[in-house]
Design a protein with these regions (language model features):
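A basic- and aromatic-enriched beta-loop-alpha substructure that forms the phosphate/nucleotide-
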Residues: 1, 14-15, 137-154
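Nucleotidyltransferase catalytic core that binds NTPs
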Residues: 1-64
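A glycine- and Lys/Arg-enriched "phosphate-lid" helix/loop adjacent to the NTP-binding pocket
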Residues: 43, 151, 155-194
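Hydrophobic anchor at the beta1->P-loop junction of P-loop NTPases
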Residues: 68
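The conserved Walker
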Residues: 72
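Conserved lysine of the Walker
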Residues: 76
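Hydrophobic positions on the alpha1 helix immediately C-terminal to the Walker A/P-loop
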Residues: 79, 83
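Conserved substrate/cofactor phosphate-moiety recognition/catalytic segment
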Residues: 85-128
């Protein structure tokens, strides 16, 4: 923490001495566990099983993020959605696709670095928003800022901005690399099977 908290809320016996160590005021809450029938110690023993007890801001920080990466038409969206369904969790669609669909009829199809930065930031913000809804501790992401950086390089041939994109991105717990091991399908938004 950047500074000591002023208040500590707990339902644990160690709450008072813990708060004193930080020079904070302690508030004992629900000691008999009538409102929240689980202790912090029990939650920590099996975080995935008890993830639903966490407040949204804690879910955002503690959920495990699995990100799909790969070329166009490699099944990223299909796999992300199927994994979320199988794991009964949240999945994050690709913001860049929505953005592209929104601008696709412009006469001037040139892109700017600023657009890619906004796409990357929006993708990360969408991940953070949806992470707050996770109930089982896992967030499935169709893409992330790293993939946006690759598209930036493809469209603008600028290879020196990777660290700028990655500054938006918390590294995921797992990248799932989708390979082009089946036929490429044109869905109206894809550019090239190469």
């Amino acid at each position: 923490l950047p500074r000591s908290p002023d208040l500590v809320f707990s339902s644990e016996d160690y709450g008072e001495p813990w708060a004193q160590l930080m020079r904070a005021k302690h508030f004992l809450v629900d000691r008999d566990r009538t409102e929240f029938p689980i202790s912090g110690s029990e939650i920590r023993k099996d975080l995935g099983e008890h993830f639903h007890w966490l407040v949204p801001s804690a879910k955002e920080d503690l959920c495990r993020k699995f990100v799909m990466v790969g070329a166009e038409s490699t099944g990223k969206t299909t796999i992300a959605e199927a994994l979320a369904k199988k794991l009964n969790t949240v999945w994050v669609p690709e913001h860049g696709r929505w953005y592209w669909e929104g601008r696709r009829y412009l006469k001037d199809q040139s892109w700017s670095t600023d657009e890619f930065f906004r796409i990357a930031k929006a993708q990360i913000n969408l991940q953070k928003d949806l992470a707050r809804l996770v109930s089982k501790g896992i967030l499935i992401c169709d893409t992330d800022a790293l993939v946006t950086a690759v598209w930036h390089q493809r469209y603008l041939s600028e290879f020196d901005k990777l660290e700028n994109f990655m500054s938006f991105n918390d590294l995921p717990d797992l990248y799932l690399i989708c390979c082009p091991d089946f036929d490429w399908i044109q869905d109206g938004t894809r550019e090239s099977k190469d």
